Amino acid sequence: MHYSRLCAVLIDCKTSDVDEAARFWGEALGRPVDPSHPGTRGGYRMLETPPDEPIVQIQRVNHDSRVHIDIETDDIPAEVTRLGKLGAKVVDQLERWVVMQAPTGQRFCVVRVQRPGFPKNAKRWD
């Protein structure tokens, strides 16, 4: 048994200026950059987000710009197995998360719990 839920929407930006990208998206979404958030570092900028909503993060990338989601779980291997049975494929396994690809081609990440209140609004998988 494990739990999982939508954790974050990541806006992948192929840019040399992640601060400018974050400024644009922050203003577009009405959520300023949160400079004190531990996720604001290197090529990442966190936007201010209420604790009961998915995180919005701007990420500097080398691939084409796109949007992807993160699914947070209390058991990454179990969630990867569950999603694999649905047809998703593992693209890359990193130290703290797994990149997967849906049967329809979209990439997404399976990550450890990151938002407060977990497992509120999470689905229990037996």
Indicate where each model-derived feature is located:
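Short secondary-structure junctions
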Residues: L29-P38, K85-Q93
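Conserved short beta-strand elements that form part of the metal-binding/catalytic scaffold
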Residues: R31-V67, R107-Q114
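Amphipathic alpha-helical segments
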Residues: D17-P32, E79-K85
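Vicinal oxygen chelate
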Residues: T15, P51, D64, I69-R107
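N-terminal beta-strand motif that seeds the catalytic metal site of vicinal oxygen chelate
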Residues: M1-A22, V67-I71, Q114-D126
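A generic structural signal for short, solvent-exposed coil/turn residues
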Residues: M1-Y3, W25, P38-G39, E48-P50, ...
